[in-house]
Amino acid sequence: MALVKELLGKAPQIGENTFLAETATIIGDVVMGKDCSIWYNAVIRGDVNYIKMGDKVNVQDNAMLHCTFEKFPLEIGNNVSIGHNAIVHGCRIKDNVLIGMGSIVMDDCLVEENSIVGAGSVVTQGTHIKSGEVWGGVPARKIKDISSALLEGEVNRIANNYVKYSSWYKE
């Protein structure tokens, strides 16, 4: 069973039809929408500020979600994939976004809807990724505009697949 821990009088609120892997950790002021999945060794730590996640968010294995005390909460929209080993910290991620494996998104960043942060990228503090952009690198920079094929073939496909994968573990 996942570690779901109340802290300072605030208990995580887990959305309907959400899968929590046995080694996932969810602490404090965390609110999740429905159809989310939190995978093995992922940590969602709402201890120093709040974390709000929309519907159909998948937080893949070993990812870390955190926020900044008295400054930056973490807000994640709907249909978002946070790749394996990613760190997402004190930022805003809108709907239909893919944060690639091993990426770091730092405080006060805004990732608008229908965007991709490529695997291994470092999105430095205060960066604004506009709607429909693909970013990558260290530090991350705009690579190109997203195509409809990339949006459907990656962003939506991965989010939908993780809803399916999580159903396998609930049986």
Task: Locate each region found by the language model.
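Short proline/glycine- and basic residue-enriched helix-capping loop/turn segments at helix->loop/beta transitions
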Residues: 81
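Glycine-rich hexapeptide-repeat left-handed beta-helix
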Residues: 1-13, 47, 53-55, 61-64, ...
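N-terminal segments that cap or nucleate solenoid repeat domains
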Residues: 2-38
